[in-house]
């Protein structure tokens, strides 16, 4: 696990030097959003790899145990609120650590932040235009106004083709929301007023994905 793909230096940076996926993503975020607070939530086995590759340039939150993305996002947001002192009206963007994407992807993150700050919705998702009918991805089926009609998890290729014809997008696994939105949801499951408190109660949080527990209920 410590040699996970995001740590392998198989890519080249702008100077032609070897870099890993996590180093590339860090660089791309900094190029498009220099003032961003960057936080990585991870397990104990990857702490050393993260620190050796991006040093102290990012904050790292250690998950006490593996409990899927919903608890991990709650833990991360509580860290931002209680340890970093971020205003609870701040926009937060959650994304995978290893997207192999160009600058346009990271510019889209800024647009998601703008939509959240405008109060467009409680959660903004990234939909990616499909290039082929894949059975490996989840799909977002949007309404004409850009809201979500429904989600479809990993359909058959035949059904995926039908979804694409209906205007479906690949679910990019990227979410934007205001910090207080998630903290309010978290307090339905645990009473806490500090990062250490929610960390101590981590095992009480539902072991479920953020998509299922929050996004699809919104």
For each of these PLM feature ranges, what is it?
Residues 129-130, 139-218:
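Catalytic core of tubulin tyrosine ligase-like
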Residues 1-50, 56-67, 79, 106-107, ...:
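N-terminal glycine-rich phosphate-binding loop and ensuing alpha1 helix
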Residues 3, 34, 56, 88, ...:
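Residue-level preference for short coil/turn positions at secondary-structure junctions
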Residues 37-39, 91, 122-123, 174:
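Beta-sheet entry/capping signal
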């Amino acid at each position: 696990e410590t040699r996970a793909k995001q740590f392998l230096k198989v890519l080249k940076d702008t100077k032609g030097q070897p870099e890993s996926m996590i180093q590339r993503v860090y660089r791309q975020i900094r190029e498009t959003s220099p003032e961003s607070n960057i936080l990585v939530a991870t397990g104990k086995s990857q702490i050393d790899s993260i620190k050796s590759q991006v040093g102290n340039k990012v904050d790292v939150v250690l998950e006490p145990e593996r409990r899927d993305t919903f608890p991990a996002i709650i833990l991360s947001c509580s860290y931002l609120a209680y340890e970093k002192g971020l205003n609870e009206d701040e926009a937060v963007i959650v994304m995978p650590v290893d997207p192999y994407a160009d600058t346009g992807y990271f510019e889209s993150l800024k647009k998601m932040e703008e939509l959240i700050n405008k109060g467009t919705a409680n959660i903004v998702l990234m939909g990616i235009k499909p290039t082929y009918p894949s059975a490996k991805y989840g799909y977002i089926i949007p309404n004409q106004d850009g809201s979500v009609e429904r989600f479809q998890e990993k359909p058959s290729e035949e059904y995926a083709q039908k979804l694409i014809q209906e205007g479906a997008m690949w679910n990019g696994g990227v979410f934007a929301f205001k910090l207080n939105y998630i903290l309010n949801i978290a307090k339905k499951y645990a009473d806490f007023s500090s990062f250490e408190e929610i960390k101590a109660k981590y095992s009480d949080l539902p072991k479920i994905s953020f998509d299922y527990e929050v996004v699809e209920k919104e």
